[in-house]
Swiss-Prot record:
Any one GO CC term of the record: extracellular region
Chain segments carrying region Disordered: 483-567, 598-651
Organism: Toxoplasma gondii (strain ATCC 50861 / VEG)
Biased composition (Pro residues): 483-547
Taxonomic path: Eukaryota, Sar, Alveolata, Apicomplexa, Conoidasida
Chain segments annotated as transmembrane: 571-591
Protein name, entry field: Apical membrane antigen 1-like protein
Length: 651
């Protein structure tokens, strides 16, 4: 290999090594940053598994013994203190722009609406836990306004807060009573219901600060003991708090839904069945009165539900997703169910009872439940679905500008922001119909966030009067658009293209034009010229003198002069006529001579029959003067036909 080529290859190899070294250093720095970021994670972020959610976003799956699996969005990752003790900004770009994830007050308010995370169980029917082979109510948030509608005959009380039936009522079909635990303390005090004032007195100042927290703790602390075996059960029963009577109920029946003619009756039909049908409902009468919850609401901190759960509706706001610098509200296009709603209350009830809401309702029940009522409560071993809190649990109530109708749009996506809309309301299947305002922002420190310019309209999120406000402004201008500078692209070198050699163009060969065939022209019959007759001059007529010519007088002399003049004119006229006749004779002679010399066309050559029985010798025979041709040929022909005697005799 030449020395110059080896030198070029060596330089190229050296350049490649330098590039690889730079890439290696960059990779080490990236890996180091990743390790440091992992080391900064809080203890709550340990033992996590990354999965893909329904909305195709990465989410962290938290697991523990005390709570079912819940999903935590990656874009709401908790911040950790850096080496300087300051709160670090989130690493996800979308989180940097979303104030509902970056600002502490707004982020804490937004987290409570992540129902799979904060509740983790069914809402319409909550049977998300299993204990000792029994299905157990396990949600971590109270459900406001939830009641159980009984379908007993008209003579029954139809109140699910009545005492549950005992063995004394087993003969009645359907069974009377409700779901309340009828146990009694040895002191004679009823186990349920119990006044909140008594709970507050017994628990003291160290107890929960909220009535719901105290009721939940009462149910959580209950231990069922079988008196015959002294077996202690760890099964936890649900509770209901009545805010009007301020009473706490502990239910002995965990079932919340029973339907179908195979299992239950409605108003006694069909007859003979043990159970009357029942189902969960939210009614306006119970909206502010009843709160249904599991005993696990009190696990850990009995008052945590107050700040951790979506207990109320949000006024003048809609749930949405943060996209491109703005909160895009959920509407009919992103909903799973969207219909007109006449009022807000209707939308609040609809989001709780829609068929896609989070529910742990069984689909089948044991057949033995119709024969022995003790086998029914509360085991449903035939089917035991667990929703984990996932479902269509959110609804937006708003006025649709296009149709002028109020719409209730229900959706199953976890929202991550609120879009401020005057007159709108954001509901959840867990919360009450009570409306609360969005948290306040700081107008002095909040930096407006501008969304993208779409169709010449840009959405700007601002803090006006300590409240979030989204306004639209025109964003299209007419500036000079400077295209991005691109490196010049050299056109590929193409070999010169030689022009194609065209073959010589030959003129088109025209077919020979045949002359038109003219019909034979018969020669005109030439008549022999006739000699013009020359008039002989007449002698002048000499008139005798009239009488008196011999006498004198001027008169006779004048008459003589006139006569002489008239004789001269006559001679001139006669000479002119004679000259014309001579000229005509010459012309006729020339014409006759011309036709004598012209050959006859072969097609017109006279035959023997046409020439009187002889062959014509030449064209001159026609032009021979009649005095020669007629007499000579006539004589010859006469001799050949009749003989000379006949001619002589004829003439």
């Amino acid at each position: 290999m030449p020395t110059e080529s080896r030198s070029i290859l060596a330089r190229a190899e050296e350049t490649r090594c330098r590039h690889l070294s730079r890439l290696l250093r960059a990779g080490l720095v990236f890996l180091l940053c990743d390790v440091l970021t992992s080391c900064l994670a809080t203890p709550e972020l340990q033992n996590t598994v990354i999965r893909s959610s329904k909305a195709h976003h990465l989410q962290l799956l938290f697991s523990s013994r005390s709570t079912p699996a819940v999903k935590f969005p990656l874009d709401a990752t908790l911040s950790a203190p850096n080496s300087f003790g300051e709160q670090e900004a989130r690493s996800v770009e979308a989180v940097k722009q979303n104030p509902w994830a970056t600002t502490t007050a707004f982020a804490d308010f937004m987290k409570r609406f992540n129902i799979p995370q904060v509740h983790g169980s069914g809402i319409f029917v909550d049977l998300g836990r299993d204990t000792e082979g029994y299905r157990e109510v396990g949600g971590k948030c109270p459900v406001f306004g939830k009641a159980i509608q009984m379908h007993q005959p008209a003579e029954y009380s139809n109140n699910f807060l009545d005492d549950a039936p005992t063995s004394n009522d087993a003969s009645k079909k359907p069974l009377p009573g409700g779901f309340n635990n009828p146990q009694v303390y040895t002191s004679g005090q009823k186990f349920s219901p119990i006044d909140d004032s008594l709970l507050q007195e017994r628990l003291g100042t160290a107890g929960p600060k909220t009535a719901i927290g105290r009721c939940a703790l009462y149910a959580y602390s209950t231990i069922a003991v079988n008196p015959s075996t002294n077996y202690t059960s760890t099964y936890k029963y649900p509770f209901v708090y009545d805010a009007v009577s301020r009473k706490c109920y502990v239910l002995s029946v965990s079932a919340q839904l029973l339907k179908g003619e195979k299992y239950c009756s409605v108003n006694g039909t069909p007859s003979g069945l043990t159970w009357a049908c029942f189902e969960p409902v939210k009614e306006k009468s119970s909206a502010r009165a009843l709160v249904y919850g599991s005993a696990f609401v009190a696990e850990g901190n009995p008052d945590a539900w107050q700040s951790a759960c979506p207990n109320d509706a949000v006024k003048d706001a809609l749930f949405g997703k943060w996209e491109d610098g703005q909160c895009v509200p959920f509407d009919t296009k992103t909903s799973v169910q969207s219909d007109q709603a006449t009022n807000k209350e209707e939308c609040w009830k609809r989001v709780f009872a829609n068929p896609l809401v989070a529910s742990d309702a069984p689909t089948t029940y044991p057949e033995a439940a119709q024969k022995n009522w003790n086998d029914f409560w509360p085991v449903h071993e035939q089917s035991s679905p667990k929703s984990g809190g996932f479902g269509a649990n959110w609804a937006n109530f708003y006025l649709e500008k296009e149709s002028g109708e109020t719409i209730c749009a229900i959706f199953d996506q976890v929202p991550d922001c609120f879009a401020p809309i005057t007159g709108a309301v954001a509901y959840t299947a867990l919360g009450s119909s009570t409306e609360v305002n969005l948290p306040q922002c700081d107008s002095a420190s909040f930096i407006p966030i501008e969304g993208p310019c779409n169709n010449c309209v840009q959405v700007v999120t601002e803090c006006v009067g300590n409240q979030f406000d989204q306004t639209s402004k025109a964003c299209c201008t007419e500036p000079e658009i400077i295209p991005p500078v691109k490196p010049p692209v050299e056109p590929p070198v193409e070999p010169p293209v030689e022009p194609p050699v065209e073959p010589p163009v030959e003129p088109p060969v025209e077919p020979p034009v045949e002359p038109p065939v003219e019909p034979p022209v018969e020669p005109p019959v030439v008549e022999p010229p006739t000699e013009p007759s020359v008039p002989e001059p007449e002698p002048p007529v000499v008139l005798p003198p009239t009488p008196g010519e011999g006498g004198g007088g001027g008169t006779s002399g004048d008459e003589t002069v006139e006569k002489e003049g008239s004789g001269g004119n006559t001679a001139l006229i006669a000479g002119s006529v004679l000259g014309m006749l001579i000229i005509l004779a010459l012309v006729g002679t020339c014409v006759g001579f011309y036709y004598r010399k012209r050959p006859l066309p072969p097609t017109e050559r006279p035959t023997v029959e046409a020439s009187g029985g002889r062959e014509v010798e030449g064209p001159s025979d026609v032009a021979v003067p009649p005095d020669h041709s007629w007499w000579g040929e006539g004589e010859h022909e006469t001799e050949s036909l009749l003989g000379s005697r006949a001619v002589d005799a004829e003439f």
